[in-house]
Amino acid sequence: MNRLSLGARWLLASCISLSMLSSPVVHAESYAASYQAQPQMSMREQINQYWFRAAKEGDLKIINTLIDAKFDLNHADSKGYSALILAAYHGHDAVVNRLLLAGANPCHKDQRGNTALMGAIFKAEVRIAKTLIAADCQADQPNYNGQTAAMYAALFGRTELLKALEARGANLDQADPLGNTARRISQGELRTR
């Protein structure tokens, strides 16, 4: 089996939850119009919907309004995605910076253990990833498959981010259950079983 197919299998196994974040956003004429289309929603459900949509779409005005109203910055949806994870994944650096400034938890994990940093690395959001690397999180924080942000950076060839993670204290020799390390991955070695 060639290297590409091994890499493709590992990539699929390790990134499936991150790709789920890119599901299409349902655009409505306005937030109010979406409420009228779903009147059975409680006020809390509506606010949650506004919060997550604003994070995905980069709507800083709605984010600021809800922050000012003391909305729970770390509230997560049914998949464990926080507004910070969604904003990082969708490339909204102004929203990421505002959420961090307001006190959002940069170390929050979704239901698969992935963080906003892992999503930013996956999507090549370098500026956002650098911001999140500087946050007060364990540099080697693994997801529930034992994979770290450094492994993602190595897998996707994000050399600049891999160096930044190493400078922040990431152990490039920390292994996942298959024996993969960021160092090995960056050298083209990838174990799939």
Each model region followed by its residue ranges:
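Leucine-rich solenoid repeat scaffolds
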Residues: A154, T159-R193
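Conserved ankyrin/ankyrin-like repeat signature
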Residues: I62, A94-V95, R127-I128, E160-L161, ...
